[in-house]
Amino acid sequence: MEQQEKNEIRLELPEKVRQIIEQIQKHGFEAYAVGGCVRDSLLGRTPDDWDITTSAKPQEVKAIFPRTIDTGIEHGTVTVMMGKEGFEVTTYRIDGAYLDGRHPESVEFSSNLVEDLKRRDFTINAMAYYAQKGLVDVFEGIEDMQRIVVRCVGN
């Protein structure tokens, strides 16, 4: 699928997710829904949760929103509270070596969305979305979903 066609894909973001993304963008940063919520939406499923990735650093995210929780701030993750709901907002990052298979020994914050998507496990989870930009799918996750293939990013 060509990038032009991917840009024409429209997903319905929950109102609170849209508000978080727009608020971050209003402050001059990039922000996208990312990962499993994008995959599930493309498959017509209702996501269990919505994750957001951003070029804003954790302290910048905390300065934008009145209610946040330091969920995993050393890994760039802040939970933004919207009413009683929490949404994880994570800074673009490049992960160091994984010692336990799940948590990186070190992280380096980045300002590049593609660098952040590279660290994800599977191509079908390495997609990001926001209405004004459309779908960002540099690792052909849609094609893998259509072929019913689970492929690691980088393979």
Predicted regions and their residues:
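Catalytic cores of the polymerase beta-like nucleotidyltransferase superfamily
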Residues: 1-155
